Amino acid sequence: MARSFAMPGDMDAASMKEQRPVLDELASANEDLTIDMSKVEFIDSSGVGALVFIYKRLLSSGFKLKLESLKGQPLQLLTYLRLTDIVAR
């Protein structure tokens, strides 16, 4: 079974602080996770860190993280960091 979550907006330090409880819950779910990134126009190191945190937690439990609808700056940054190689798209 897979769970879906739509990221509500940009993934910067301020928004990641607000989203932390939700992201902790998602990372603890015992199922694959798909994150819809269609509303994310900007991501900084806090957002990247949150995605890596979720990815590692899911991977350690045998589950996968998939990012959907990556575009613009988030796609460019995650591609540059080679995170799109480890996260299914």
List the predicted regions and their residue ranges.
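Amphipathic alpha-helical interaction surfaces in cytosolic regulatory modules
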Residues: A13-V87
